[in-house]
């Protein structure tokens, strides 16, 4: 069990709400491989409705969700176009290569996580050249986690879709935190995904479920994705006990988990505003905190490890972001305004301990 009182390492650390736990205990179940589980069916129907797609598929994880989409879209030897450092490339154990047998062309992105659509078009391979792989898919991530979880607006997603479709390939949206994007932009998720041929979203991040993601797309796409899920060992039996929290999370209004994401965004901004004024904290523009991620650096990056160790001793968890370039804090269900105040006080004490700031004046 974590010793952390305030765990800001990720929104994956969330615990299910009491109502989710009750829903799990009382879930009506059946054999989902035989398509007999009514709770899973209800979740998939709700997900399809919210995303504006024909059908949906419950999967154990976001990694599996993205992978089954790649397996459907990309033939062996095909190539995927994505942004440098995108999640499927950098954080999913190279499954696009190991399982799908695909390669990936990586394009630079701007500060908001946007690839240039003209660059996407230029990245397409010449299909008549037998020396080259076949361009098979464009993938985009929304929110864009490496860029302070910036939400990408519908117009940009549609422009990427045009570039993909003009080249004769589909667009997949890795929407692990697509509901954060929708709340930040005040647009329906269906509008964000209108131009996408497939998408995934995660239930176990900001939506606070204990497990699971959902793949959405056309009915034919989901039929093929179901087969890919089976190949990966993702077909489960009485899995309504895991799908039930997802139905709670996707409810409309305050009884669900989507609307309350605005609280996480507000807490992230409070944290950023407080950190930005502290000596020793650099590379943080609070205006760029639009969802639930806060990235920052120390004026002496070599002190990153003792800083994080000091916070852990204070009961506060943050993350040395992969690549060792920044520190990350993520707000989520279970983190309240008072926790942000306590975190800021802990940061002040630790900065003083490691010599980056004067000792705080006792209250």
Where are the regions that the model predicts?
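Conserved PLP-enzyme active-site core in the AAT-like
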Residues: 1-298, 305-314, 319-335, 340-363
């Amino acid at each position: 069990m974590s010793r952390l009182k305030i765990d800001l390492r990720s929104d994956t650390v969330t615990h299910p709400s009491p109502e989710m736990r009750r829903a799990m205990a009382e879930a009506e179940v059946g054999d989902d491989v035989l398509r007999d589980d009514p709770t899973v069916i209800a979740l998939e129907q709700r997900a399809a409705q919210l995303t504006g797609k024909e059908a949906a598929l419950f999967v154990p994880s976001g990694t599996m969700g993205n992978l089954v989409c790649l397996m459907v879209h990309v033939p062996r030897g095909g190539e995927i176009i994505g942004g440098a450092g995108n999640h499927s490339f950098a954080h999913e154990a190279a499954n696009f290569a190991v399982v799908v047998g695909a390669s990936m062309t990586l394009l630079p992105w701007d500060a908001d996580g946007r690839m240039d659509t003209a660059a996407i078009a230029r990245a397409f391979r010449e299909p008549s050249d037998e020396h080259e792989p076949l361009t098979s898919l464009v993938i985009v991530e929304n929110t864009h986690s490496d860029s302070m979880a910036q939400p990408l607006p519908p117009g940009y997603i549609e422009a990427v879709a045009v570039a993909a479709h003009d080249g004769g390939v589909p667009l997949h949206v890795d929407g692990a935190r697509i509901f954060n994007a929708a709340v930040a932009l005040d647009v329906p998720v269906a509008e964000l995904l209108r131009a996408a041929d497939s998408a995934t979203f995660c239930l176990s991040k900001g939506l606070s479920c204990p497990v699971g993601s959902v793949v959405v797309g056309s009915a034919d796409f989901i039929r093929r994705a179901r087969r890919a899920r089976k190949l990966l060992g993702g077909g489960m039996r009485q899995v309504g006990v895991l799908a039930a929290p997802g139905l709670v999370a996707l409810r409309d209004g305050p009884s669900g988990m989507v609307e309350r994401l605005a609280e996480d965004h507000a807490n992230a901004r409070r944290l950023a505003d407080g950190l930005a004024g502290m000596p020793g904290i650099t590379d943080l523009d609070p205006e760029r905190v639009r969802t639930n991620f806060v990235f920052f650096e120390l004026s002496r990056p070599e002190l990153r490890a003792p800083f994080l160790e000091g916070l852990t001793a204070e009961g506060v968890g943050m993350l040395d972001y992969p690549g060792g370039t920044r520190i990350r804090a993520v707000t989520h269900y279970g983190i309240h305004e008072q926790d942000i105040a306590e975190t800021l006080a802990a940061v002040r004490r630790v900065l003083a301990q490691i010599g980056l700031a004067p000792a705080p004046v006792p209250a």
